[in-house]
């Protein structure tokens, strides 16, 4: 399955007591299908993967594959700090039916660029799934350089990158690597429209948890080079781009999900949205239904 358009980095709904909320998860999957997204990510950073037990990871991924697998890609977050553990987690995701592994640069350990190349080649060779690289230095402390990506893009089982560094120079460098065998995806909602217009393949989004149709519409218009309509949709979504960054992800988007009846709180060490942002969350939640309705016209 190709990787393009809008892919939602799914949040993981929990109940008020902190337990996994399977009913909320099913409602979130339904919302994404209704919104026409082109793929989903299960158990990434937005999904609070670091807080999940193995049993919870299995339940989330297996149920997502059962509900939407075969229709759109179901990517699984499998990146961990060690190579052997990442391979093991990738094999686990393959056995559960994931279409791709989204593999973040190893957090905390800060490998060299040569170390990244060796790490990703090992995962691609031994993990059993097509690998999508994921660069988000603000979270991991490790910035995978375009030259490193170029080295990895030639591997037949490394099929794309989610790049969360949204600056123009980085996007241009990665565009040179784009091919039918290697997709370039934005990991930054706020700069995605500009990047897609420049030629990248799509967006792995946080905001589309609550606005799948609206973010899909923005991505489709950007890919079609309808500049005026793209700018109009990007402007409508700008308050959501901004709000999702007022506190560490996924705190803000989970506050919005709670306001539309999906899930409750987060797991420690993340805390619920600060009271100073509640009014903004209430206001934005009130706009969601109208924006989703408009996106279908």
From Swiss-Prot:
Name listed for the protein in its UniProt record = 4-hydroxy-tetrahydrodipicolinate synthase
One Gene Ontology cellular component annotation? cytosol
Principal subcellular localization: cytoplasm
Query: What NCBIfam families does the database record attribute to this sequence?
Result: dapA (TIGR00674)
Xref: Pfam families: DHDPS
- Binding partners and assembly: Homotetramer; dimer of dimers.
Superkingdom is Bacteria
Q: Top-down, what is the taxonomic lineage of the species of origin?
A: Bacteria, Pseudomonadati, Pseudomonadota, Gammaproteobacteria, Lysobacterales
The UniProt record lists the EC number as 4.3.3.7
Catalyzed reaction equations = L-aspartate 4-semialdehyde + pyruvate = (2S,4S)-4-hydroxy-2,3,4,5-tetrahydrodipicolinate + H2O + H(+)
Record site: Part of a proton relay during catalysis: 45, 108
| UniProt KW keywords | Amino-acid biosynthesis, Cytoplasm, Diaminopimelate biosynthesis, Lyase, Lysine biosynthesis, Schiff base
Q: In which pathway does it act?
A: Amino-acid biosynthesis; L-lysine biosynthesis via DAP pathway; (S)-tetrahydrodipicolinate from L-aspartate: step 3/4
State where pyruvate binds.
46, 204
Gene designation per UniProt: dapA
Query: Which GO molecular-function terms appear in the entry?
Result: 4-hydroxy-tetrahydrodipicolinate synthase activity
Biological process according to GO? diaminopimelate biosynthetic process; lysine biosynthetic process via diaminopimelate
What does the function comment of this entry state?
Catalyzes the condensation of (S)-aspartate-beta-semialdehyde [(S)-ASA] and pyruvate to 4-hydroxy-tetrahydrodipicolinate (HTPA).
- Which HAMAP family does the annotation name? DapA (MF_00418)
Catalytic positions are 134 (proton donor/acceptor), 162 (schiff-base intermediate with substrate)
Compartments, record wording: Cytoplasm
- Asked if Cell division is a keyword of the record, the answer is no
Family assignment from sequence similarity: Belongs to the DapA family.
Organism field: Stenotrophomonas maltophilia (strain K279a)
CDD domains in the cross-refs: DHDPS
